[in-house]
């Protein structure tokens, strides 16, 4: 099928308005959230499940490479094309217009269509006293429920593990190149044909008596037990864990998801955030061991930051912090799209500095007063390592008692209970940390190389959780920034190297060090185009997509 005929066929399905082909208009969708970009013949926006099905049918018939895309919040370039040297036309299928969420069993589960976001689910569930899998970070920037499932998204919450379900509806291209619809939703009376199934789902009415599949998992229900195993010789969670790879779950877009069925969670009646500081890594090891061994209630979350990322996020993540606090989360995805389009246009003007919007936002944020509360800043000055420990209900008293009577007796440690302002600021600051390294590098392009970001899962029994890099690496480093999900032993490590450093050589050395520790990577960001998939993932991807049609 010729390119003009392909574009015409796609437009006939979704309307010309929803088929983008101009470079300027597709720039945002062809680029990654942090990095990465490539070429595409078209970006298509179906509005219904049937339109999505027909678009994919057209692409399969035309022998296109299909990239399934949602809100493009992935951090490893997996939601955009990689380069401009594909051997066939690339079509990006963006499913953000298909956003229905259906409550099941009084809200204990939901059925989500592919474009439905975690933020929308959070708002829908709040009156019912329930919450989605993730409630910070991914919800803030508009990530979809399906995207989380497809990438084993971990999130910050200690009780929930990776996003996971065994109940899904998806399109799959078999070894003969035929597109098939696989219905494993566990719901009766949806119909037999794609048209019938899609129509019944989009009506949004599913009686409880039609629900089956109760023997299948709609979340990682065993995670609370796994995280407590302090002798574990495997990480608690990581992207290539064979126990968490199942059809759409962990598929990374190698099938086309049309709907997933997932569990929801009760909202705690009370929450309290504690800020902890120490200059010795072993003090936090003692805390982790005690909490996971003795507490009846697991923490809601326990987020780690080192001083380097605290300082960098304070300065270079300030605009993100202020945007979320004062503009809210709903406008952020659109704001990112506008920023990306502006960058694409401005970067084509030779005499202008690259990433001009980043420069503007950085200097604009500097006009605002200090955004972090005084007690957080005092801890930054006193300590090298920080934990943001969030407890709920009975766990609040457990934590308070342990911190006051035992942990605080350790030499050189301290903690305080956050008030509401401090709690909000601490969590927003931790979220703003995720983009701080990129912003720093964008503003220091003449003296630094691109950011090397590693997403790491340490073994459950690893006590040496603070990295000690050899001189052959540190002599080339400008900044080493560490943050992550401490109880889960999942860490995000952003390295900014001096100009002229061989980044690939540095990455190989670091990965060899991690391999020697038995660590797994990536932990929760998926391989995208930035990591090599191990044999477990490769075999899984090949079983899902033997013709390599999806998400190159």
Predicted regions and their residues:
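Conserved glycine-rich FAD pyrophosphate-binding loop
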Residues: 33-35, 41, 71, 76-88, ...
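Anion (oxyanion) recognition and catalysis
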Residues: 60, 126, 515
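N-terminal flexible segment immediately upstream of the FAD-binding catalytic core
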Residues: 1-60, 74-110, 262, 309-317, ...
